[in-house]
Amino acid sequence: MKKLLALMLCGAMGLSAVACGQTETEETTETSEAVETEETTAEAETTSTGTVDNSFAEDTDALVEAYSDAFDQVEYTDDETGLTVTYNIYLPEGYDESEEYPMVVFIADSSCAGDDATASLTQGRGALVWASDEWQAANPSIVLVPTYPETILDDQNGYSTTEYVELTKRLIDDVSEEYAVDTDRIYGTGQSMGCMTTLILASEYPDLYAACMFVDGQWDVSTLSALEDQTFIYFAAEDDTSAYNGMQEVMSMFDEDGVDYTYAQWDGTWTPDELSEATSELLSGGTNAYFVSWASGTIEASSETSFAGPNSSSDDSEKPAIDTDSEKTEVSADTEASEDAESSEAGEKPEGGKGNGNDSMMQSVQYHMASFDYAYRCVAVMEWLFEN
């Protein structure tokens, strides 16, 4: 059974999440308490978020300047296929081989594929936040960031993968043996191509990750049923039609199978404090699966119109927008658009791909590329990940 959660969207009005909660109607207040059916027995989890400064990840350029050189580059040759990839690895200060450390595996989008192994470090926040002084002071950990010579999967012409996807599982195993990794605390995350790869591996190998953070990607939902037993948070921007529709498909699968999850709509303009407040409310759902959509119009579109970055020889791919008739669940209250407000009061999720009329593929790609870093500034979510 699904768990319902309502969060007010008031960042665009300059109001705090707390003040916003004070203006809710009685109906919204009732749903914001994570209403459950009789069959839902999960209680709210106790979290210890707030240990790490929630504003440290705001400046991407500063992260790149400070930490992109903190990684070593190592070649891995796969015995099964003979293929070679270069991975970036960060070892915590005072690394001791006799100890065991949690490990984050971050996989970038396809714009980072190519000959420059460090491209996956400098494209955005996703790799470097985990190696920052602020994060490592509270969570000493190993960070693994592979870079592939080519795009490793295709979601445009059906769903297909190259040998590099399965190679990634063997790479993680190899690194876990080579370094002092606590194999019960491996955390998977990635954006776009990296999100899709992490979705696939989490589904195929249920014991691989302790928890996952999926960021703006999608995959064939018929292959993802094992996610129902996984612990994760899944981010997608509503203006990124492919990723958002893919996320909705997973929620619909959970609905059909009676699996609990918590969903909330967030505002991309929220401050670090507002994001932390929203995270606390989200986690009060007490489920293992969390879904967050960035409200339409709250993500600033990127100037990028292609997945082919400076390190990429081929484009990433996206499915055309999919119309879904999935069962509607509770969503946070209104944005500026009255139609969204009416849908919220009715307990509906926003329709995929509707955002502000930006339904062209080019505009969707711009929002897609821009949305990655929004997830990796949610420090409280990162802290929750490491509690698993």
Q: What are the language-model segments listed below?
A:
Residues G21-Q22, E30-E33, E39-Y101, T189, ...:
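A domain-start/cap signature at the N-terminus of enzymes
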Residues S16-A19:
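C-terminal motif of bacterial Sec signal peptides marking the signal peptidase cleavage site
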Residues M1-L4:
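Positively charged n-region of N-terminal signal peptides that target proteins for export
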Residues M103, I107-E166:
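Active-site machinery of serine-nucleophile hydrolases
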Residues E177-E178, D184-E228:
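Primarily recognizes the serine-hydrolase "nucleophile elbow" in alpha/beta-hydrolase
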Residues E24-S48, S326-S344:
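Low-complexity, Pro/Thr/Ser/Glu-rich flexible segments characteristic
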Residues G94-Y95, E99, L153-S192:
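Gly/Ser-rich "nucleophile elbow"/oxyanion-hole loop immediately N-terminal to the catalytic nucleophile
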Residues F235, D240-Y244, D260-N388:
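C-terminal catalytic histidine-bearing segment of alpha/beta-hydrolase fold enzymes
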